[in-house]
Amino acid sequence: MPPSSFPHRADDDSVVTPIVCHPTDIDKWKHLLATVEAVIDTAAADGPEDAVRVFHLVIGVLKTVRPTYAAKLTYVKTSGAWVHGDSRDEIVSDTTPTATPHPFAAWRAVHERHVVGSTLVNGIVVRPVWVIGRSGSHLGNMLFPSAHAGKVVGLGIPGGRWSVIHQDDLADAYLRAVERGSIVGGSTFDIANEFTEGIDDILATLCRLSGAEGFTYREPTNRKRIPNVTTPA
């Protein structure tokens, strides 16, 4: 993301200074690993190649640039709730073994174990559910075009529910994990609101705010993903 994309005040000394590169282009940012307190990995990934590579690149660089007397780096890996599988009647938590992940996310469950099991970093895994809020969600891209056209078209099933978390609350979870990295290293955290949201309610609210004439549901084009984002009432 280019620097101009980050909103900030001219007198704000805490503005984020981005390094524009692919995450695996570690030569652009490996010098920072000698002194930073934490790495928060939020890179999107639909497969293990880049996600696993970034982690192992960081581990390799740490061995050469970080003093042996320095405190361990905290590495926070973003995974997802899909690793819990697609059960409609089992209750899961942070500590539930991921023995039956959804096939789409099976690789994530394996990678999680590498991160939390590392002896070279304080490895922490954060599993957000569907992220909402401003530009931090796919929800707008999915629903707004149809609302603009006059009728909201939703993804899922009538009466279904979404487990969501606002991006500000997710950011707070990252902050708390980093602040307590030396204590909670080796831990995994599911990040979700206490209550799920009814999809019908979300679509009805969008209709009211946009002036669209009602809502409907469309048949999913990728049934491998639909179980990951919806649950029956």
Where on the chain are the PLM-derived regions?
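Conserved Rossmann-fold NAD(P)-dependent oxidoreductase catalytic core, especially the SDR/UDP-sugar
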Residues: 59-106
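SDR active-site strand-loop-helix element
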Residues: 42, 75-81, 126-128
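Conserved sequence/active-site signature of Rossmann-fold short-chain dehydrogenase/reductase
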Residues: 83, 131-133, 170
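NAD(P)H-binding glycine-rich loop region in Rossmannoid oxidoreductase-like domains
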Residues: 12-67
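NAD(P)-dependent short-chain dehydrogenase/reductase
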Residues: 121-125, 129-162
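Active-site Tyr-X1-5-Lys
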Residues: 99-126
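Mid/C-terminal beta-alpha module of Rossmann-like enzyme folds, strongest
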Residues: 173-232
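A conserved structural motif in NAD(P)-dependent oxidoreductases
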Residues: 163-170
